[in-house]
Amino acid sequence: MADTCCSRTCVVAASTLSVCSSDLSCGNQVSSPSACIGSSWQVDDCQETCCEPTCCAPSCCAPAPRLTLICAPVNCESSPCCQPACSSSSPCQQACCVPVCCRPVCCTPVCCRPVCCRPVCCTPVCCRPVCCRPVCCRPVCCRPVCCTPVCCRPMCCEASPCSAPSSCCRPSSSVSLLCRPVCRPTCCVPTFFCQPSCCHPASSVSLLCQPSCSSSAC
């Protein structure tokens, strides 16, 4: 069953293959139930290898007698979701770059996960900085070891004439499981067209960074 040319894996359906309980190694030959006289039968969940060229067509993995092979998906190489999730020029961390070719789940980057930012828009562009108003990323930094968003700035900066994106709010160090940004007193100068506060108070929600501002801070 094994083939040296194989680079991918086919999984044998658990309900279609059994081996004698006295010999459960993956490399042994599987025979019919009549050959296992006096032995009970158990499910063999060992992975079997097969030769799958780039087409990934079902014909590349022809089922053997009494076996059903699950090779998938068909034409996976032609799908944009089957390309490696990261490249050498990607801002993502290379240590977590895992190719997603031939996997049924698509459009879910597996490498674009910096320390405090979790992408939810199915594209690696989430790892790019988004000023003040995150679109694809949502800071999830309210954890003891995770209080500095990497790809998205905290949600405390509101775009307004009296706020400066670079100096409005900065996240404080994490306390327990809550992380709250603090406002610097000099971040907002009241004007005729502006509200006197650059940071709008918001309640802190678990696992989310929310601004926590007092009226005297700005």
UniProtKB/Swiss-Prot annotation:
It comes from the Eukaryota. Keywords: Keratin, Repeat. Residues 26-202 are annotated as: 16 X 5 AA repeats of C-C-X(3). Pfam families: Keratin_B2_2. Transmembrane segments: none annotated. One of its GO terms (cellular component) is cytosol. Sequence repeats lie at residues 50-54, 55-59, 60-64, 86-90, 96-100, 101-105, 111-115, 121-125, 131-135, 136-140, 141-145, 151-155, 161-167, 168-172, 187-191, 198-202. Interacts with hair keratins. In the hair cortex, hair keratin intermediate filaments are embedded in an interfilamentous matrix, consisting of hair keratin-associated proteins (KRTAP), which are essential for the formation of a rigid and resistant hair shaft through their extensive disulfide bond cross-linking with abundant cysteine residues of hair keratins. The matrix proteins include the high-sulfur and high-glycine-tyrosine keratins. This is Keratin-associated protein 10-8.
